[in-house]
């Protein structure tokens, strides 16, 4: 018999909205934390201290565990590794080179290194999605929702985008603090252009969430500029590029030179302004 989830009160619904804005989690996962911890501060602390949300339905958990077991690495049975990830992608019809939904899964399912998945966060992450997903066909059917969320939800975009940086630099234990430029360009090209053309856009212009003013032409200038600089990409430049893209106007006039922007972005603004003066 299917379990019946009690509806959230108006107060709890507001707390769920606040929790999602802070953490970038799904509605289902946010609701689990709010129901368990009752107060926003306690729920957020638990989330960032990696305390688990309430367990999934036992039957769902068992089935998801069986999915994980199917792909785990025979030489390291505590992990799904690259070979298993490629098999998983094949079953889910994901092209890992061109489909950013794999990064959605990585962020939501707690992947700490590229192509690696521990069992507990893998199971809990899928269980946090709506619809009682307990099979690969159900997970595959949910992927279009994640793809749409990535290009339309600013908080989710930032969560997945920043997690991609951590993966690409080698995970949380890596001593590498920046990304090779070629890697960064590949990832920017994967994340930014699809969001430019979606309405609503994850890169909507602030403060009014109007259509983006930083679009493909400005993005192309950014790539051109970075290729000329030919430098590795720092975490600050990576993360703040999203805020910059959402705040800058089409003519690059409304830029706060005194703001706490990375020097790379300062230099880019001057680069674009010089180009515009020369037109």
Curated annotation (Swiss-Prot):
Keywords, alphabetical: Ubl conjugation pathway
Residues annotated as domain UBA-like: 12-48
InterPro entries: DCN-prot (IPR014764), DCN1-like_PONY (IPR042460), PONY_dom (IPR005176)
Superkingdom per UniProt: Eukaryota
GO biological process, one term: protein neddylation
DCUN1 domain span: 59-273
GO molecular function, one term: cullin family protein binding
Keyword Nucleotide-binding belongs to the record: no
One Gene Ontology CC term in the entry: ubiquitin ligase complex
Protein task: May contribute to neddylation of cullin components of SCF-type E3 ubiquitin ligase complexes. Neddylation of cullins play an essential role in the regulation of SCF-type complexes activity.
Name of this protein: Defective in cullin neddylation protein 1
Source species of the chain: Cryptococcus neoformans var. neoformans serotype D (strain B-3501A) (Filobasidiella neoformans)
